[in-house]
Amino acid sequence: MKKKNALVFLLGPITPTGRFGMSPVWELVSNLRQFFTAEAALINEGVAVVNPANDIFALLIGQDRFSEKMAKEKSLDKLSHCDVALALPGWERSEGAKTEKEKADELKIPVFYNLTLLLESLKVDDMMDDISENENEK
């Protein structure tokens, strides 16, 4: 998979759980920050990203006929079109993220747990593709 063509799905906690004594609003902000920080880092490296946290804004603005259940279904559909997934810290405490991880495994989509390792893997894939292209040109 070439880096510039790879589509990365972000999975992690979005919905506040109240498990850490944080206010639900602060926990939501913290969770969203994690998604948008990862998205920005990937985009800065030229990687295309599917960020399900973007769908939360439709819920926040009260868009008619858009529910949390629909957002989760939409995420699973988007995941099926991705090449790789990045599990953000705390993913294992989110029922939605665990479902996305199971779906990624079912679809044989590689799941990374570290942004740096994901980027390194994509760069290695780019180099191998370039070597292969050069060999084919000979």
Q: In which residue ranges do the predicted regions lie?
A:
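Conserved catalytic or regulatory cores that recognize and/or transform ribose-phosphate-containing ligands
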Residues: 1-138
